[in-house]
Design a protein with these regions (language model features):
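Active-site glycine- and acidic-residue-rich loops that bind
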Residues: 123, 180-196, 204, 210, ...
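His/Asp/Glu-enriched, well-ordered alpha-helical/loop segment
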Residues: 229, 254-258, 287, 298-384
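Active-site gating loops and adjacent loop-to-helix segments of metal-dependent hydrolytic enzymes
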Residues: 72-104, 138, 142-148, 213-261, ...
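Glycine-enriched alpha-helix->loop->beta-strand junction motifs that scaffold or abut catalytic
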Residues: 137-141, 196-203, 257-260, 277-286, ...
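Histidine-rich, glycine-flanked metal-binding segment
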Residues: 1-5, 12-58
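Alpha-helical scaffold segments that flank or form the walls of functional sites
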Residues: 56-57, 74-137, 158-172
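C-terminal cap of metal-dependent C-N hydrolases
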Residues: 356, 372-422
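Histidine-centered catalytic micro-motifs
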Residues: 59-71, 205-214
Length: 422
């Protein structure tokens, strides 16, 4: 059996653990066979040793929420006047793009992600072409086919199109598909129920944007405010539409969405009842720290969510509201700006929590025997003090040296490492 051994000065098998001068053994077909202190093995033609030197090997970083379709839309330096103004601008820009434009921007975003250490991402696809665009990209993708329809009469039409997209075979071994009703202000109750039933029947995840803004809370509670004006301006608010009169989480709970292992994106504004409801289900929350800051939201309740035991993963959102698609940049932002979060919590959110959210928690997110060998390798400065390694990493020491997916080097800044097909 052919075996590859990856060695480095530091290995983080999972958050809260650190090994020094360690080796990760990978056997065909790309699973971890063991971790151990490094000792030179006897010569063996079936063993290839990849020495990353002064580096950290950690579980592959997981971007649990992104929109690669918006990679062409760099966020403005100036904060938008309102969320709906920003949303309207995104809609206008997207209407100008051709299919080729969208495909190119998706590929560009995937390659930026891979080069920053991401091995698995949750991609929202509103165009329906993400799976085809990403078929040659060497990272894992869970692609959420997005649906939008606030008019009840359009729910059937939206579901027919969604089923058609989901029935297409996955184009590569690293792709799988799921469903994403966009948000409570853009999806009718009928469509939410139908997508939840579809996700249940297909044994897959459902992702939805939720409790993202105060204006969303107002719209669902009373039907007034910024979102009403926005939807009326688009001609998207059905005649006689009535608000549910509930907080976003309670609303989706009533519709049965929380009965699934749902992925609740953002959750910037949650009351205690909402958090208790999330805790009582097998749902995950995805926190997008720098996008959250871009819109000037109040502090995210991530500390409370973690204390309650809710699974919180990290996402970058899109370049329309962020500076990069790097999960490592999100981690470092949190280290600088959320002093209430510990290093191991930040690492956990970027690895195993993301894997759990996307449904890969039993095979990804840790460096453990039997798990897929998805790893991020970060080059560390020579002469680094041999203490508080995780803190130094999050302070900014280290840059992405390689991204390894299923035991194969998918990207590296050291091209010589690609020789031999490791």
């Amino acid at each position: 059996m052919i075996r590859t051994v990856h060695i480095a000065k530091y290995v983080i098998p999972e958050a809260g653990m650190l090994l020094r001068n360690a080796a990760v053994h990978v056997s065909d077909p790309g699973r971890i066979s063991r971790l151990e202190p490094w000792q030179s093995p006897p010569p063996n033609l079936e063993t290839k040793v990849v020495d990353w030197g002064c580096a950290i090997i950690l579980p592959g970083l997981v971007n649990a929420h992104t929109h690669l379709e918006l990679t062409h839309l760099p966020g403005q330096e100036k904060r938008p006047a309102s969320f709906t103004q920003w949303l309207a601008e995104v809609i206008r820009e997207k209407q100008r793009w051709s299919r080729a434009d969208i495909q190119e921007t998706i590929i560009r975003g995937a390659r930026q992600s891979l080069a920053s250490g991401t091995t698995l991402l949750g991609e929202i696809s509103s165009s329906g072409i993400s799976r085809e665009a990403l078929k040659h990209e060497k990272l894992r993708k869970l692609i959420f086919e997005e649906v939008i329809a606030l008019t009840p009469e359009k729910a059937g039409e939206a579901m027919a199109a969604l089923n058609q997209r989901l029935d297409r075979p996955d184009p590569d071994a690293f792709s799988s598909s799921s469903v994403s009703p966009h948000a409570p202000y853009s999806v009718s109750p009928e469509l939410y129920r139908a997508t939840a039933e579809l996700a249940r029947a297909r044994h897959t995840r459902l992702a939805t944007h939720l409790a993202e803004t105060k204006q969303e809370l107002e719209f669902l509670a009373s039907g007034t405010g910024e979102f009403r004006s926005f939807l009326c301006g688009l001609g998207a608010l059905p005649p006689g539409w009535m608000p549910p009169g509930l907080a976003p989480v309670a609303y989706l709970d009533k519709l049965g969405v929380l009965d699934l292992p749902a992925i609740l994106i953002h959750c910037n504004y949650l009351d205690e009842d909402s958090m208790v409801r999330i805790l009582s289900r097998s749902c995950s929350v995805v926190y997008c720290p720098r996008s959250h800051a871009y819109f000037g939201h109040e502090p995210h309740p991530v500390r409370r969510l973690l204390d309650m035991g809710i699974n919180v993963a990290l996402g970058t959102d899109s370049l329309a509201s962020n500076e990069s698609l790097s999960v490592l940049d999100e981690m470092r932002y949190l280290f600088r700006n959320r002093k209430d979060l510990k290093c191991d919590e930040i690492i956990r959110m970027a690895t195993i929590n993301g894997a759990v959210a996307l449904g890969f928690g039993n095979v990804l997110g840790r460096l453990r025997r039997g798990y897929w060998a998805d790893m991020t390798v970060l080059r560390m400065p020579e002469g680094l003090a041999d203490r508080n390694i995780e803190a130094q990493l999050l302070e900014g020491a280290g840059e992405c040296l390689a991204t390894i997916v299923q035991g194969r080097i998918a990207w590296t800044s050291a091209p010589g490492m690609l020789t031999g097909g490791a």
